[in-house]
């Protein structure tokens, strides 16, 4: 790994830490710190670690997406970091989709109710699935271009 890549990786990590400290404070990094989300009569208690992980993955993904596109897939290290961040973002988005889908199932309250379509959470779920598909396509394309560039270099 080149020195420039190490500096970019450390700089991005420091930026993520500063942003997380400014948003969540020192208490946000403690194991017992949680965030309560109240939606109608349902409470979701989510550890702050999940929000910190989400923000960190999104920042790393966006920084290395821009670096990868700017360098035209020529830098192997940037491409690998991008693919790792893409896989982590798929993991995080899958968890968010499961939370949204569980809330879609809670909306049914009667025994013989009609199915509700086009609710806000239904649209959010579809948008998250679309983002997930776009990330998978970007990772596949990045792997393809990395393989082509790596083969040309040998």
Name each region found by the language model.
Residues 15-30, 126:
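Alpha-helical transmembrane segments of multi-pass membrane proteins
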Residues 54-72:
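Canonical alpha-helical transmembrane segments
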Residues 1-12, 146-148:
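N-terminal membrane topogenic signal
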Residues 8-22, 80-99:
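Hydrophobic alpha-helical membrane-insertion segments
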């Amino acid at each position: 790994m080149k020195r420039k890549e190490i500096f970019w990786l450390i700089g991005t990590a420091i930026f993520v830490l500063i942003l997380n400290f400014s948003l969540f404070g020192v208490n946000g990094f403690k194991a017992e710190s949680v965030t309560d989300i109240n939606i109608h009569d349902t409470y979701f208690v989510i550890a702050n670690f999940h929000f910190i992980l989400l923000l960190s993955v999104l920042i790393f993904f966006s920084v290395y997406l821009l670096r990868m596109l700017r360098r035209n897939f020529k830098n192997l290290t940037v491409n690998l970091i991008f693919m790792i961040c893409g896989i982590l973002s798929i993991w995080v988005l899958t968890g968010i989709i499961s939370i949204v889908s569980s809330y879609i199932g809670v909306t049914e309250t009667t025994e013989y109710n009609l199915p509700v379509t086009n609710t806000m959470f239904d649209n959010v779920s579809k948008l998250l699935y679309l983002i997930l598909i776009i990330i998978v396509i970007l990772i596949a394309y990045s792997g393809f271009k990395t393989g082509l560039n790596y083969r040309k270099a040998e």
